[in-house]
């Protein structure tokens, strides 16, 4: 069994995926800034509801950001702890790539303060690395890559369809100590 965790945006997205890469069950909730209070409880509920013991989870799939600083941190700490304690495989993908269709497109996420996170991909290859830029600069980049579809702020995105679409493109982490969330900006002080 695989456990998918995404806490990078305004939603807590969790899923159990079987060995045939089919979603067994999923959970999604708008968090209202209470991410740290609900994620562990919701994972426990999802596992219990499906009669899955923690030891049956053989891999964790995690979105690493960018997005909410706290959200990125919460999912990251849970995934890293689980991978270390239960000695399971860890797979990661950034939330900008995850938002694209088949790993191709201009991916944008609002970073607040008149800035946006942006990255550009073609067939899962980075053409423009994940960055945080002023809105004006983002518009200029969009014009340069106008042949690609634009995906913004997870509008009309079904997280669980995306999970199955991208599952084989998550990157396995060999050494969890070398992984960090993809923040791209400093936390608000």
Regions found by a protein language model. Name each.
Residues 12-13, 17-128:
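Nucleotide and nucleotide-moiety/phosphate-recognizing core
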């Amino acid at each position: 069994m695989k456990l998918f965790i995404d806490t990078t945006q305004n939603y807590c997205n969790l899923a159990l995926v079987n060995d045939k890469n089919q979603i067994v069950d999923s959970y999604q909730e708008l968090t209202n800034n209470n991410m740290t209070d609900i994620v562990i409880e919701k994972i426990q509920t999802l596992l219990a509801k499906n009669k899955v013991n923690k030891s049956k989870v053989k891999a964790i799939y995690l979105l690493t950001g960018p997005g909410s600083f706290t959200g990125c941190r919460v999912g990251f700490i849970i995934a890293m702890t689980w991978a270390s304690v239960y000695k399971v495989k860890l797979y990661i993908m950034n939330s900008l790539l995850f938002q694209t269709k088949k790993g191709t497109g201009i991916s944008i996420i609002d970073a607040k303060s008149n800035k946006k996170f942006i990255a550009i991909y073609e067939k899962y290859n980075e053409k423009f690395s994940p960055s945080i830029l002023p809105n004006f600069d983002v518009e200029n980049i969009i014009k340069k890559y106008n042949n690609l579809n634009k995906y913004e702020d997870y509008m009309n995105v079904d997280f669980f369809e995306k999970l199955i679409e991208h599952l084989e493109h998550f990157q396995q982490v060999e050494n969890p100590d070398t992984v960090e969330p993809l923040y791209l900006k400093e936390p608000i002080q």
